[in-house]
Curated annotation (Swiss-Prot):
Native organism: Methanothermobacter thermautotrophicus (strain ATCC 29096 / DSM 1053 / JCM 10044 / NBRC 100330 / Delta H) (Methanobacterium thermoautotrophicum)
Name of the protein in its database record: Energy-coupling factor transporter ATP-binding protein EcfA
Phylogenetic placement of the source organism: Archaea, Methanobacteriati, Methanobacteriota, Methanomada group, Methanobacteria
Gene3D superfamilies: P-loop containing nucleotide triphosphate hydrolases (3.40.50.300)
Entry annotated with the keyword ATP-binding: yes
Major place of residence: membrane
EC number: 7.-.-.-
Length: 311
């Protein structure tokens, strides 16, 4: 659905931002692009609907090479919707209704179809009833949802969201991810960038790691988060579950890195057998208990014991 071939880009002031990126995303896939600040994630996204034109290389969307003619750009912007990092860059109308209607109106659709799309899109993001509110008076999470609705109203096949959960409380962030998972179930290809490792492991089927404008790795979240050295190089941290198991592994336990809390507990219980809590204490012995406390820190160690006791 998306293919980048040897894509390179430098900003007009000479700052190199992307160097020889090759990337393929299949139709309906959920992918995350991760990497430290300045790695080139936003620059890459701006190439996906022709806002930026590559200095070298090609952008291929749905089998067609973007050729940057006016007609082609209109077509591509219908197909690929981008939700910017800051919703204030996207929302500019006096009311939510007008903002969401802006795209479909520009497509020249009849009024009743525009109305239908506005209602449907606001419903999908849980913002029905906000039609007459002023976008600039909404909360950060609400603005984000209206910005997503504005893109949905264009009925895109690909949605690209630059850091969709940044600055949102955990519950609101989870709500945004649930919306994106639902869109993906409807067949939309969804690509996000994020620094939030918990969100990435919850959302993505495949992860691309960018660093200094280069693609340095790609794989499933598990493949990426198993590679502690890569994570360090990309200035990220491991998800909490992977971090815990990784530390146990370093302490000499035979565990594998898992990403979900459920899988982590299974891994721990598998390690410990039934009656986990008592066996843990017995199994650790004094020396290993000390090593474990040292590695995990006292607080985490007691949290682990407590969690196992609850099982
Ligand atoms: N308009 C611009 N003019 C000049 N340089 C720019 C411009 N926008 C971005 N850059 C530079 O291009 C590089 C890539 O920036 P980009 O915003 O794509 O990174 P990012 O991975 O999205 O970062 P972040 O996680 O901080 O959002 C950086 O070195 C940045 O300073």
């Amino acid at each position: 659905m998306i293919e980048l071939r040897d894509l390179s880009y430098s900003y007009p002031d000479g700052t190199p931002a992307l160097r020889g990126i090759n990337m393929k995303v299949e139709r309906g896939e959920r992918v995350a692009v991760i990497g430290p600040n300045g790695a080139g994630k936003s620059t890459l996204f701006l190439h996906l609907n022709g806002i930026l034109k590559p200095a070298a290389g090609e952008v291929i969307i749905d089998g067609e090479r973007v050729d940057y003619s006016k007609d082609e750009l209109i077509k591509i912007r219908q197909k690929v919707g981008i939700v910017f990092q800051n919703p204030d860059d996207q929302l500019f109308s006096p009311t939510v209704r007008e903002d969401v209607a802006f795209g479909p109106m520009n497509l020249g659709l009849p009024e009743d179809e525009v109305e239908e799309r506005v209602a449907e899109s606001l419903e999908k993001v849980g913002m029905s009833g906000y039609e007459n509110r002023a976008p600039h008076h909404l909360s950060g999470g609400e603005k984000k949802r209206v910005a997503i609705a504005g893109i949905l109203a264009m009925k895109p096949e690909i949605m690209v969201l630059d850091e969709p959960t940044t600055g949102l409380d955990p519950e609101t962030a989870d709500g945004i991810i649930r919306i994106l998972l639902e869109l993906s179930r409807e067949g939309i290809t969804v690509m996000i960038s994020s620094h939030d490792v918990e969100i990435i492991s919850q959302f993505a089927e495949r992860v691309f790691v960018l660093n200094s404008g280069e693609l340095i790795a790609e794989g499933t979240p598990l493949e990426i988060f198993r590679d502690a050295e890569l994570i360090r190089r990309a200035s990220l941290r491991l998800p909490r579950t992977a971090d815990l198991l990784n530390r146990l592994r370093m302490a000499g336990f035979e565990v594998d890195v898992k990403l979900t809390v459920e899988e982590t507990y299974h891994e721990l219980l598998h390690l410990l057998g039934g009656d986990a809590y008592h066996r843990l204490l017995h199994f650790l012995g004094e020396e290993k208990q000390h090593r474990l406390i040292h590695l995990l820190g006292e607080k985490k160690y007691h949290e682990l014991l407590h969690a196992l006791k609850e099982q």
